[in-house]
């Protein structure tokens, strides 16, 4: 399962120098404040003076004290974030905690331990905007911070996450009062923000779970490594992920990680987190060892095949899920597919006969969901049997990555009109389910 076509926080471009970004934002803010003044009173330019950006205003006074104080505080917070990042990457927990008030230490200890267990190799912190006073808390400021991270591989493209931080002025250096949970509408809260984690790292995967499920970790790692070898062959752009990131959730974590709230029929999902990465989450409840193999192949194939921005929409759901199901069955004969009974029931009634009308509702019953996945698998299977896996992946790239019309992509890749191919796929499904 995927999260459809999520719009992630648009924070995935290579970071600029932190201070330059911050000063540019402050400059725009100041210009907006003065836009109502007559043009004759404002003649200015922005010049880069070493490590500072200065806004010159001929005939106007220096910035007001509040603006100047916010700028200076932002510089000091940035320095503290830099110290904390250096300590994290060095494995220096005392240094990681040193920038914070004691009340924040328990949460920061958990974050530090989880990130170190995940083998964090890149940790960059850049202020997003300027500090704002916290109402009712004199001397306390809130600042959004964009954190970028890599696990295991030091040269990966970092994944971004935007987190609110609160700071208290205390002498020369501000002190971190609290680090909030990220609450992106698209991705929700990452596991390392909220949970203790135990982690195993293999040649192709990083697998994390909770201490309560520690005993399952060796088997999970073995199965994930086997699934990764299958998923690698579905990397549409030819470059599989540096590591597949898999998070195995207990009941409480399933409701909390990445925002929770998944449909009841969901056994796992892949969510895009930026930096070219999709993180896979598995629901520990109700998974059998055999079912876990199929599910891992399915979800890791999403991570290998999907573009960073997600897929175009529900009309292409059948292609996205059909490819993942095709990888999940891993070459087994079609008559051994476990969902054939559900396919027969859905094909006999309740389905319009259109592939672009297969995406199940969140509250759909389990047999309707299984039938939708099964029909999608059979349609993709038919296309692979006729044209081969390589051309199917070319078709997938054109439709899902390049977002071209299905009819246009079919003509170019398969050399046949899409209406005829669509009808052939449907006939194949009905022939097997009749």
Segments predicted by a language model, with ranges:
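Juxtacatalytic substrate-recognition/specificity segment
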Residues: 199-312, 316, 347
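Short solvent-exposed beta->alpha transition segments
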Residues: 69-72, 90-136
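Short, low-complexity N-terminal intrinsically disordered segments enriched in polar/charged residues
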Residues: 33-34, 39-90
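Beta/coil-rich, acidic/histidine-enriched accessory regions frequently appended to metallopeptidases
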Residues: 1-52, 116-120, 364-370, 401-434
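Surface-exposed, charged secondary-structure patches
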Residues: 112-158, 286, 297
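Second-shell loop/turn segments in exported
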Residues: 67-72, 83-85, 206-221, 281-291, ...
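Acidic/His/Gly-enriched intrinsically disordered linker/tail segments
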Residues: 272-275, 291-295, 310-434
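Short beta-strand edge/turn micro-motifs at domain boundaries
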Residues: 2-23, 44, 48-53, 142, ...
């Amino acid at each position: 399962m995927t999260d459809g076509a999520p719009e992630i926080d648009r924070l995935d471009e290579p970071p600029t120098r932190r201070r330059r970004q911050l000063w540019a934002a402050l400059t725009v803010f100041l210009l907006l404040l003065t836009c109502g003044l007559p043009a004759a009173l404002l003649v200015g330019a922005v010049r880069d003076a070493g490590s500072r950006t200065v806004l010159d205003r001929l005939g106007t006074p220096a910035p007001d004290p509040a603006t100047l104080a916010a700028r200076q505080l932002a510089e000091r917070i940035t320095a503290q974030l830099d110290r904390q990042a250096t300590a994290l990457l060095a494995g220096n927990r005392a240094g990681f905690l040193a920038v914070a008030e004691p009340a924040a230490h328990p949460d920061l200890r958990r974050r530090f331990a989880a990130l170190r267990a995940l083998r964090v190799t890149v940790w960059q912190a850049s202020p997003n905007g300027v500090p704002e006073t916290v109402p009712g808390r004199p001397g306390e400021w809130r600042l959004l911070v964009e954190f970028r991270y890599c696990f295991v591989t030091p040269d990966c493209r970092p994944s971004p996450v935007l987190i609110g931080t609160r700071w208290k002025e205390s002498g020369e250096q501000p002190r971190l009062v609290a680090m909030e949970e990220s609450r992106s509408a698209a991705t929700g809260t990452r596991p390392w923000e909220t949970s203790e984690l135990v982690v195993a790292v293999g040649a192709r995967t990083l697998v994390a779970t909770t201490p309560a499920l520690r005993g399952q970790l060796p088997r999970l790692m073995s199965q994930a490594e086997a699934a990764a070898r299958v998923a690698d062959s579905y990397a549409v752009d030819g470059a599989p992920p540096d590591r597949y990131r898999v998070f195995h959730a207990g009941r409480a974590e399933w409701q909390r990680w990445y925002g929770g709230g998944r449909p009841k029929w969901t056994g796992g999902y892949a969510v895009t987190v930026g930096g070219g990465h999709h993180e896979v989450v598995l629901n520990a409840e109700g998974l059998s060892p055999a079912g876990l193999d199929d599910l891992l192949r399915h979800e890791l194939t999403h991570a290998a095949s999907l573009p960073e921005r997600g897929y175009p929409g529900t009309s292409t759901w059948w292609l996205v899920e059909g490819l993942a199901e095709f990888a999940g069955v891993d070459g087994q004969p079609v008559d051994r597919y476990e969902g054939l009974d559900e396919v027969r029931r859905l094909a006999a009634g309740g389905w319009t006969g259109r592939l672009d009308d297969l995406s199940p509702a969140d509250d759909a019953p389990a047999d309707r969901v299984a039938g939708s996945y099964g029909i999608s698998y059979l349609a993709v299977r038919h296309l692979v049997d006729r044209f081969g896996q390589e051309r199917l992946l070319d078709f997938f790239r054109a439709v899902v990555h390049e977002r071209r019309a299905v009819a246009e992509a079919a003509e170019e890749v398969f050399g046949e009109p899409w209406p005829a191919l669509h009808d052939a796929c449907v006939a194949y499904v009905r022939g097997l389910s009749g």
